[in-house]
Amino acid sequence: MDSTDNSQSVGDVQFAPLARTIIKITGSDRAAFLHNFSTNDIVKMQPGDRCEAFITSVQGKTLGHVVVYCVEEALVLVTADGQQETLINHLDRYIIMEDVELENCSGIASTWLLFGEGIPSVASELNGVEFMSPYGYCGETCQLLLGDASTAESLEQLQVREASSDQIETLRLEAGFVEFGVDVTEANLPQEVARDAIAISFTKGCYLGQETVARIDALGHVNWLMRTMTGIGLASLNAGDEIAGDDGKKIARLTSCSNASDPNQKIALGYVHNDFAESGTTIADGIQVA
């Protein structure tokens, strides 16, 4: 690795460790199999493609929110830390005669976020890492690196700065990226998470839980929608807090809260009642739907 000054080429690139669940699906039936147990159109994916999807239960609830990467001879699922047992056990019970293997790759490699405009310059200098991109966790430039214990040292030698966990959380909320187990749980319906355009295909045909998803689509809406909220009124609130309307009824519940990049603002993710979910709506003093 060239140890010369890379400060100009790396630009504003930063990195941070991020524990992830990584599941590799192999076998000739892998695409058709995952297609039958998730909300997106997996069989259309080609090597190099990436999509988001929900893994749904028979009741149509969300067992997981995953980013799916199609690589040569495999599909790779990336999601929040600690989800491997739930997802593998769920999917494994449906493997009967299919040529499908599920491999828990969590913990085999160290996982890192890399984000910023100078990523190509950094990538050309790194050896022994695999890039999963785009990831989207903290913005459009965000990539996930699969490396080892030496990855952080290599990045520091390239003068890539390590971001704080608070900074990563702010960027995640500003990107509107939901974290399973924090913003989404098994109690949620896929449409409540409000990622229909990027995580749900309404034309792909049958899959486990599809009847519930299709019924909601036919009815027109769910009562609660995931939304980004901003405003100084969030300063006194925390994840789990609820916001009531003038009549005392709950109109929002926060799932994640952080400082915004603007030091005069706060930001949160949470579920807002459908009647108040339109962008620009003021739901409380100093709190607006983004």
What function would you assign to each model-found segment?
Residues 2-10, 54-65, 95-98, 123-132, ...:
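Short amphipathic beta-strand starts and helix->beta connectors
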Residues 12-15, 21-22, 67-178:
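Acidic, low-complexity central loop/insert segments
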